[in-house]
Design a protein with these regions (language model features):
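Proteins enriched for Cys/Gly/acidic motifs involved in redox and nucleic-acid/cofactor modification
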Residues: 19-20, 100-127, 133
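Internal, well-ordered alpha-helical segments in soluble enzyme and binding-protein domains
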Residues: 57, 80, 84-87, 100-107, ...
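A short, flexible N-terminal coil/short beta segment enriched in small residues
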Residues: 7-13, 103-113, 204-208
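Zn2+-dependent cytidine deaminase-like catalytic core
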Residues: 3-103, 188, 275
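Enzymes that bind and transform nitrogen-containing heteroaromatic metabolites
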Residues: 35, 114, 121-330
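Short, well-ordered, mixed-charge alpha-helical segments that flank or form enzyme active sites
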Residues: 50-52, 77-81, 103-107, 130-135, ...
């Protein structure tokens, strides 16, 4: 949100990492009452008009005696859609909508998609060596620091990362954002673990108290469930399709928990399964400039063919990755 008065920007704000307060509230709270009066506030999405974790933004705008509200697109949330426009107009506030709508539609692509189908927008990510290996047997990073940084930025834009217990037991990943300034934007984590076989010393298990973590399971013992709860893990029983956890069920659950997009970082088996069932909306494939050779593990030679078969558009980016390559499928 940007607030302008007498042709000068007097305040701005963005939605907090937790989703609340909204951008409007964060921009308005920086100003004194007299500064807010007769100003114009620019926002991308129609201000909310319902009570949730915080009061409605329209009430805040009205109380601030804002003269004019400019926003890009109506919110698809039925609690707000079109209602805020009417409320603001009825309070004699000038309202202009559809401002730079084309750009806003791109920004809110994931959000609108999730609202329409009640499931998150699904991204996938893999990093492979030049000779198509997923892992180095010596546990060295496959890609360079530039690629790793881009991957962390990608995580910062995601609500929840989906992974498997096999990936955790093998690699013990952190799945957070480890770039200065983005630490607070680490996504939630969802672990797929049908029989609850996750290692008790894993980082994710022992860090759940600091970052919301779900574990989807099917077969269990009370002892295992109690252990998960003691670690602040949220266990969720999932039905099976064949011998696998029902991924549609998992997506719907994650959407109900407020996740509008997810990123799958789950290795060869999960990625192939979801590709075969066309679950991905977009996919990022990082390709290292290095060959691993005899130290390589988990070869995925047909991955580029499988991705090309699933997606219509491909964008190759090497600009900021030194000798590595990033292929974006969408």
């Amino acid at each position: 949100a940007v607030i302008v008065k007498d042709d000068k920007v007097i305040s701005f704000g963005s939605t907090s990492a937790s989703g609340r307060p909204h951008a409007e509230a964060n921009a308005l709270r920086k100003l004194h009452k007299n500064e807010k009066k007769d100003s114009t506030i620019y926002v991308s999405l129609e201000p909310c008009s319902h009570f949730g974790k915080s009061p409605p933004c329209v009430d805040n705008i009205i109380a601030s005696k804002i003269k004019r509200v400019v926003y890009s697109i109506n919110d698809l949330d039925s609690r707000t859609s079109g209602k805020s426009y009417k409320i603001l107009k009825s309070n004699k506030i000038i309202v202009k909508k559809n401002f730079l709508k084309h750009f806003a539609n791109k920004i809110y692509k994931d959000y609108f998609y999730s609202k329409k189908i009640n499931k998150p927008y699904v991204y996938g990510k893999l990093a492979i060596s030049k000779d198509f290996f997923l892992k180095d047997k010596k546990n060295f990073y496959i890609t360079n620091n530039h690629s790793l940084n881009v991957a962390h930025v990608l995580r910062s834009k995601i609500n929840c990362i989906i992974t498997t217990y096999k990936t955790i037991n093998s690699d013990n990943p952190k799945l957070n954002c480890r770039i200065d300034g983005l630490n607070n934007f680490s996504p939630e984590v969802a672990i797929l673990d049908k029989d609850i076989n996750i290692k008790k010393n894993s980082f994710l298990l022992n860090n759940a108290k600091n970052n919301k973590t779900y574990l989807f399971y099917n077969r269990f013992t009370k002892e295992k469930i109690n252990f998960l709860k003691s670690k602040k893990i949220i266990p969720i029983k999932s039905p099976l399709i064949g011998d696998c956890l029902d991924f549609n069920f998992i997506l719907k659950k994650l959407y109900r928990f407020g996740n509008t997009n997810v990123l799958v970082e789950g290795g060869k088996i999960l990625t192939n399964s979801l590709l075969n069932k066309s679950f991905f909306n977009e996919f990022y494939l990082f390709i290292s400039s290095k060959k691993i050779g005899k130290n390589g593990n988990l070869k995925v030679k047909n991955i580029k063919y499988a991705l090309s078969r699933n997606f219509k558009k491909i964008k190759i980016n090497q600009t900021f990755l030194d000798k590595d390559k990033l292929i974006h499928y969408y």
